[in-house]
Swiss-Prot record:
Pfam families: Ribonuc_L-PSP. Disulfide bonds: none annotated. This is RutC family protein aq_364. Belongs to the RutC family. CDD domains: YjgF_YER057c_UK114_family (cd00448). The lineage of its organism: Bacteria, Pseudomonadati, Aquificota, Aquificia, Aquificales. GO terms for molecular function: deaminase activity.
Length: 125
């Protein structure tokens, strides 16, 4: 087992790793839309989702993986009415991936730092 961390993604907001690689799997901890340069949550739902995917890309790159390696996505969203907007951004992110990952989206009351969305990723080598 090895910890994956990069300065190109935000430091965790709690006592956990950005990601952990074990037995060919990469488990990326839930990401919220924090800009790693400022350490601040970006404003706006769309902007948060886009920032999350930038953070995911940075962690994947540090682990030597790409979007094509993502097999499972778990999304937590505080306003299920934004599901359609989420799907549009998500579809664009995975547009060049031939096999789309499995996914679940869960509506929740609130998230850390008042984020509107949090995304957790599982990838495989």
């Amino acid at each position: 087992m090895r910890e994956i961390k990069t300065p190109k993604a935000p430091v965790p907001v709690g006592p956990y790793s950005q990601a952990v690689e074990v037995n060919g799997f990469l488990f990326i901890s839930g990401q919220i839309g924090i800009n790693p340069e400022t350490g601040k949550l970006v404003e706006g739902f769309k902007e948060q989702v886009i920032q999350i995917f930038k953070n995911v890309d940075a962690i994947l790159e540090e682990a030597g993986l790409k979007r094509e390696n993502i097999v499972k996505v778990t999304i937590y969203i505080t306003d299920i009415k934004k599901f359609k907007e989420l799907n549009e951004i998500y579809e664009d992110y995975f547009k060049d991936v031939s096999v789309k990952p499995a996914r679940v989206t869960v509506g929740v009351k609130e998230l850390p730092l008042n984020a509107e969305v949090e995304i957790e990723i599982v990838a495989v080598k």
